[in-house]
Amino acid sequence: MESQRNILLIGLLFVSFLLWQQWQTDQAPQPVAMESSSTIPSSSTSDSHSSDVPDADSALPAAVVASKELITVNTDQLIIKINPIGGDIVYSALVEHKLELDKDEPFVLLEQTKDINYIAQSGLIGRNGIDSSSKGRAHFDSASREYTLASGQDTLEVPLTFVADNGATYTKMFVFHRGQFKVDVDYVIDNSTDQQLQVQMYGQIKHSIKQSESSMMMPTYRGAAFSTANTRYEKYSFDDMADKNLDEKTLGGWAAMLQHYFVSAWVPPANDQNIIFSSISAGGQANIGFRGAVYDVAPGATQTINSEFYVGPKNQEALSAISESLNLVVDYGFLWWLAVPIYKLLMFFQSLVTNWGLAIILITLTVRGMLYPLTKAQYTSMAKMRNLQPKLAEMKERFGDDRQKMGQAMMELYKKEKVNPMGGCLPILLQMPIFIALYWVLLESVELRHAPFMLWITDLSVQDPYYVMPILMGISMFVMQKMQPMAPTMDPMQQKMMQWMPVVFTVFFLWFPAGLVLYWLVGNLVAITQQKIIYAGLAKKGLK
């Protein structure tokens, strides 16, 4: 009886977790001195707010130039298109990440079309800024309309130049790196005038407000996030932006837009005082970004202002190399402290077997093996409780409706027989955080996207196309249930729920990613094996 109740408890806990997650989804110092002593940043960021940053929505018809006028950059990882008006990144395709498994079309992250506006904008504002809401955007010149990272070339520089009316030259330099999704976006200001110039860099990500494509089975997040010196990682949804504009002063920091598996992020200099801001523009665009330190450029001096932009998959190693907290966009929730070592172990197994399906099997075997002592304690406790059932039934007849005497007698019996009535469910409660953490690792790991296993499973991140594994998983649950016959004293309602549990779980898992179903199926098979071994050992001790 205790075994069925515990299986029922697992089911209820898991379904409750999914429902809770879906509810969560729905509510869902001074800058350092520069190289030139005649060119210094101001002691603080500007007191102005994000209204200083130009609103691209109002200039959208002018900004969306013909495709032939865009500057195209090709690297081994990225296809980038830059608008010469402002130098905004208006298109990014990830070469090695396909849109669909059976097509050669690359996954497009940033794009600017009639229906979608998801771009990375940056510029210079302030007294002598070349981009502002009043002056409009700078029109840059480029030596070429197409740049390609050649074989044997590790970096590719794409310079855009603009000469202001006062004679000062502004160069917007994009630097691309082989094997990376990071782009260095730097401004070089050559002040050939006899007046001091004052500029402030900003970078923002503009995103059409769009509902998340998550479901109860795949609770993913689409929206913004940011980091400050005091807050390493915090989501800031489109609803949050509509309620309140973000305005956080910080040393360093970053601002990002997230979706399942992919992220775009602006990372300003870590040693500069920056302001992380957000807004909802008149055209219904969600914006999040940074405004950096104000720089004073003396006559005859040259100043470089740095920033980094990441546009690509949520690869933890690549993200950590840019900012120590940027890898937190791979969000494992409140059990991150368990999920991180599980992820590292999964990566280790993948390096050994070079197959993500086999790696999932190995980590499932490892986790189940580590939890075996708890599992054994659970079944031992349940066996002892079953042996006490005749005595408990006798007590029930003896004391009738006198619950106080019945409870006292039960406690004395448990103490005498050295049985913990909670011993059957406590191990399950201890195991659930590990199972949930592993669930999140498999759900959040971009490495599983389009990763094949074997036979008909060509993508572990999507559902089994023929529903074979969910059905096998349901059968394994049915076998586990039958290995422990239902006690006649079990409540009729519990019996009905137990009988339908394999069916309910099978229906749930029909739409789960194949990697998650594989984990659960292998876990059930291991549990069946462990159960047979434990029962054999208990039988030798006279426990049934």
From Swiss-Prot:
<dbReference type="InterPro" id="IPR028053">
    <property type="entry name" value="Membr_insert_YidC_N"/>
</dbReference>
<keyword id="KW-0143">Chaperone</keyword>
<protein>
    <recommendedName>
        <fullName>Membrane protein insertase YidC</fullName>
    </recommendedName>
</protein>
<feature type="transmembrane region" description="Helical">
    <location>
        <begin position="6"/>
        <end position="26"/>
    </location>
</feature>
<dbReference type="GO" id="GO:0032977">
    <property type="term" value="F:membrane insertase activity"/>
</dbReference>
<feature type="compositionally biased region" description="Low complexity">
    <location>
        <begin position="36"/>
        <end position="48"/>
    </location>
</feature>
<keyword id="KW-0997">Cell inner membrane</keyword>
<keyword id="KW-0812">Transmembrane</keyword>
<keyword id="KW-0813">Transport</keyword>
<dbReference type="Pfam" id="PF02096">
    <property type="entry name" value="60KD_IMP"/>
</dbReference>
<feature type="transmembrane region" description="Helical">
    <location>
        <begin position="423"/>
        <end position="443"/>
    </location>
</feature>
<keyword id="KW-0472">Membrane</keyword>
<comment type="subunit">
    <text>Interacts with the Sec translocase complex via SecD. Specifically interacts with transmembrane segments of nascent integral membrane proteins during membrane integration.</text>
</comment>
<dbReference type="GO" id="GO:0015031">
    <property type="term" value="P:protein transport"/>
</dbReference>
<keyword id="KW-1003">Cell membrane</keyword>
<feature type="transmembrane region" description="Helical">
    <location>
        <begin position="460"/>
        <end position="480"/>
    </location>
</feature>
<dbReference type="InterPro" id="IPR019998">
    <property type="entry name" value="Membr_insert_YidC"/>
</dbReference>
<feature type="transmembrane region" description="Helical">
    <location>
        <begin position="503"/>
        <end position="523"/>
    </location>
</feature>
<dbReference type="InterPro" id="IPR038221">
    <property type="entry name" value="YidC_periplasmic_sf"/>
</dbReference>
<dbReference type="InterPro" id="IPR001708">
    <property type="entry name" value="YidC/ALB3/OXA1/COX18"/>
</dbReference>
<comment type="function">
    <text>Required for the insertion and/or proper folding and/or complex formation of integral membrane proteins into the membrane. Involved in integration of membrane proteins that insert both dependently and independently of the Sec translocase complex, as well as at least some lipoproteins. Aids folding of multispanning membrane proteins.</text>
</comment>
<dbReference type="GO" id="GO:0005886">
    <property type="term" value="C:plasma membrane"/>
</dbReference>
<dbReference type="Pfam" id="PF14849">
    <property type="entry name" value="YidC_periplas"/>
</dbReference>
<dbReference type="InterPro" id="IPR047196">
    <property type="entry name" value="YidC_ALB_C"/>
</dbReference>
<dbReference type="InterPro" id="IPR028055">
    <property type="entry name" value="YidC/Oxa/ALB_C"/>
</dbReference>
<keyword id="KW-1133">Transmembrane helix</keyword>
<dbReference type="GO" id="GO:0051205">
    <property type="term" value="P:protein insertion into membrane"/>
</dbReference>
<feature type="region of interest" description="Disordered">
    <location>
        <begin position="30"/>
        <end position="56"/>
    </location>
</feature>
<comment type="similarity">
    <text>Belongs to the OXA1/ALB3/YidC family. Type 1 subfamily.</text>
</comment>
<keyword id="KW-0653">Protein transport</keyword>
<feature type="transmembrane region" description="Helical">
    <location>
        <begin position="345"/>
        <end position="365"/>
    </location>
</feature>
